[in-house]
Curated annotation (Swiss-Prot):
Positions of disulphide bridges: C25-C36, C53-C142, C119-C134
Protein name from the UniProt record: Snaclec 5
Organism: Echis pyramidum leakeyi (Leakey's carpet viper)
Family: Belongs to the snaclec family.
Additional comment: Shows greater sequence similarity to the beta than alpha subunits compared to other heterodimer snaclecs.
Amino acid sequence: MGRFIFISFGLLVVFLSLSGTEAECLPDWFHYEGHCYRVFDEPKTWADAEKFCSEQANGGHLVSVHSKKEAGLVGVLAYQTLESPIVWMGLSKIWNQCDWTWTNGAKLKYEAWAEESYCIHITSKKKEWKSLPCRNYGHFVCKSPA
């Protein structure tokens, strides 16, 4: 267990050192590849979390993940900060379409499904995507353009 925490912390340090401390992000947010991220330890429903993110920063949404590297970053940050099994992401199914769409309007390109559903969270420990009823409460990560 100690080795896992040490390695996870090491990965977090590497990600943060690569991202720098860019001035484009609000205080308590961190910069990574042109976006600002912040983990919130305030359990909310998926819809309330998305609304909250949109109120925190211009262009803010629940986090969208577009690569394995970004998924790893989000998983490590969420687990290191929250140690929560439920961390909402901005992925949901639009009722009148058959396509999965991120809350920022981007189409799904990278996938890491554990199972199918309507609102998706990332398991912070295993970094897998799972589904839950959207009415459940979970912690969340917000993302906005830098």
